[in-house]
Amino acid sequence: MGLSSLPGPSEGMLCVILVNTALSISIVKGIVRSFLGIVGISLSPSSSSPSSVTVSSENSSTSESFDFRVCQPESYLEEFRNRTPTLRFESLCRCKKQADNECSVCLSKFQGDSEINKLKCGHLFHKTCLEKWIDYWNITCPLCRTPLVVVPEDHQLSSNVW
């Protein structure tokens, strides 16, 4: 009857308690974030300025500090409309080979009289499809994830100066 190599009950309990505490905190954090997202408050990693609107991957800090950013989809949609003009498909693509072009959101082909938006990245989408995309709080291109509205460089620099 040798000595047992298994830990005693009191030794193993500390690890179990720590793991359960960490998991519980993570779950509560996820629930709070989901609730705030439903209410209309999005959490974004903050840069040094609380008034920053967007944070690029270069500027994001690794700390866990967050700022609350309330952004109405209507205001973002208006800004998108002001910066991205609506075009007719026939005026943009006068070539005969129009069968290749389709909207990646609704998967239907562009007609000659279709109102489309051409993004900075070069992708084409129906105006209504892209506006519906923005209504669902998506602020990037559906295909390549580049920002729909580009923040000017001088605005980004001024928002990162404390």
Curated annotation (Swiss-Prot):
Coiled coil: none annotated. It is found in: Membrane. It comes from Arabidopsis thaliana (Mouse-ear cress). Ubiquitous. Higher expression in actively growing tissues. PANTHER family: E3 UBIQUITIN-PROTEIN LIGASE XERICO-RELATED, PTHR47258. A zinc finger (RING-type) spans 103-145. Keywords: Abscisic acid biosynthesis, Membrane, Metal-binding, Transferase, Transmembrane, Transmembrane helix, Ubl conjugation pathway, Zinc, Zinc-finger. It is an enzyme of class 2 (transferase). Interacts with UBC8 and TULP9. One of its GO terms (biological process) is abscisic acid metabolic process. Induction: Up-regulated by salt and osmotic stress. Not regulated by abscisic acid treatment. Up-regulated by the DELLA proteins RGL2, RGA and GAI. One of its GO terms (molecular function) is transferase activity. Function on abscisic acid homeostasis at post-translational level, probably through ubiquitin/proteasome-dependent substrate-specific degradation. Pathway: Protein modification; protein ubiquitination. It comes from the Eukaryota. The chain crosses the membrane at residues 12-28. Disruption phenotype: Contains lower amounts of endogenous abscisic acid and is more resistant to abscisic acid treatment during seedling establishment. It catalyses: S-ubiquitinyl-[E2 ubiquitin-conjugating enzyme]-L-cysteine + [acceptor protein]-L-lysine = [E2 ubiquitin-conjugating enzyme]-L-cysteine + N(6)-ubiquitinyl-[acceptor protein]-L-lysine. Pfam families: zf-RING_2. GO terms for cellular component: membrane. This is Probable E3 ubiquitin-protein ligase XERICO. Disulfide bonds: none annotated. Its EC number is 2.3.2.27. It is a single-pass membrane protein.
